Amino acid sequence: MFLRALNVWIASFSKFRALRTPATQLITLSVHKYSTVQRAIKIVGGFDMPGQGKAQQHKGKGREPQRKKQKAKEKSKAEGGADEVVELDVKNLLENNRRKSEENGEKHTDAETSVSVVHEGKKDSPFPETEVTVSELSSTGEGLALSPNGDHVYVVPFALPGETARVRIYKTIKPKSYSLTDLVEVLKPSKQRDDSLIKCQYFGKCSGCQLQMIPYQDQLQHKKRIIEKAYANFSGLLPELIPAIGDTMGSPMQYGYRTKLTPHFTQPARNRRQEHGSDAPEIPPIGFMMKGRRKVMDIEDCPLGTDIVRSGLKNERKRVAENLHQYPYGGTLLVRESTKRVERNKENEALPSTDKVIRTTFPEYVEEKTYITDQNGISVEYVEDYQFHNIAGTFFQNNNSILPSFTGYVRDNALHPEPKPDATPAESAAAAKSNPKLKYLLDAYCGSGLFTIVLSGTFRSSLGIDVAASSIKCARENAKLSNVPNTGFAAADAAALFKDVPYPADQTLLVIDPPRKGCDTNFLNQLLAYGPTRVLYVSCNVHTQARDVGVLVEGKNGVRYDIESIRGFDFFPQTSHVESVAVLTKAIETKEE
């Protein structure tokens, strides 16, 4: 029986390899395998959108904000990964459709007994095709389409709400009531679609971008919706505790903005078996992952990269092809922009740009852009007039064009609420004086010191802390380079981050910018025990941010926070990724019941 089943699987896989039929319209994708979908966090019922009611300031003695009721097994820590996010979007779409059906008196089919998926498409194909109409765009940038009887969802990449499309089903997750598909053909395009906006020859196959066919203002609206859903799905808070999400701040550059690319490749087994000096080795694909497949696409150019990074990508591809023997199993490459500003003179003004140096003349200096490929090399970035040196392989924001607006927003919200657009001068002045006692800045997860340094002029004293000693070394050097006074950095123990902080909590602003996984329980407990007056939570994953903010709003031992504002920032145009800043203020302390 086992051998028979194995032979059937091999035959099916052979058909699977042959099913790469070109589409006749718009976008073509190939069939592929996909990774197992991870566990989803389960939220009872549908959701209401944040901002429908004004965020309440619960100041009554002993009164704690109410969270959504959840089953015991549903309290496990959400990870905010792509699979988890898609599953929640699918779950909510199905529940909303079920609710509408019941309101209209329609009979609903149980997803567990439905046969709507099994018999669709070509019966002799292991990967059936079907026609769907997309209902909405998921938080991961994929279209979600309901089955005819509304009990199942098809996840369709590169498709937009309202579009009718032919898709190929390659995996069905019956317990979660959805299927993963390839887009074969767009039969009826949405009015929102504008394929003339697409600037990449690999779009529709490469997994890097999802939204190139959407006008930029529509991308920003979609990213605002992503944040709204993140707080509805992951925070566990009632809608009235979540303020209206602010409009997403756009990037000045929608292409040519990425200062770092990390293409990768796998050495073919044939090359590893060859003896040194034998036949010419096979050049593997060097680039990024194909959408939905565990396979690298050969990417010759990426229009998201800056000019010097794109030049560096081409040079690195050529270098690797000529030196494959140095990579017995493949590798991940680094191409990172570095900037040097030199005083203008006749000599450097006359120097031309090359494929390794791009020179631009400004009134006061000549800017030289180069690229770094050494993970341990030092890259140089300028944010406003501040200079930052970083170890090239470590984290630093990859979109320099939006950084001045982003850091300006953080600075404007460090001490007081952002004034309303229609505020009178008196109201603006009152808002500016709302937190006169804040004197100190504490920057956790400080990295190379971005926020500590940029915000230093606003506070009497600033301190950046991080568990990575190498980051602290860079931060100290950066403070010296920018001649920033009253600023210090310290390597801290993760188990006692706030133990030796010299600042009184009631006079301190805490800025946190954790990695994608967000803050762990230990850190959040330490934060609540320290209890700073104001918290600015900067996040590259709005789902884990929403989860963590929910914990801070719920509070512990009489310390909790209210959400003042939430706003997204588009660091990665053309993708579904959005970053967010949540501003929290400490509520009046209450006694735990």
Model-inferred region functions:
Residues L146-P161:
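Beta-strand/loop nucleic-acid-binding surfaces
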Residues L187-I198, G204-A321:
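Extended interfacial segments that mediate partner engagement and assembly in macromolecular machines
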Residues M1-K42:
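N-terminal mitochondrial targeting presequence
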Residues G143-S147, V167-I169, T181:
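SH3/SH3-like beta-barrel fold
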Residues V134-P148:
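Short, basic/aromatic beta-hairpin or loop at an interaction surface
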Residues T130-E136, E163-K174, G331-E337:
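Flexible glycine-rich surface loops and low-complexity tracts that mediate binding to linear polymers
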Residues R39-K68, E74-D110, K122-K123, S139, ...:
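Rossmann-like S-adenosyl-L-methionine
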Residues P50, G62, A72, S76-P126, ...:
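Terminal, basic amphipathic appendages of nucleotide-handling enzymes
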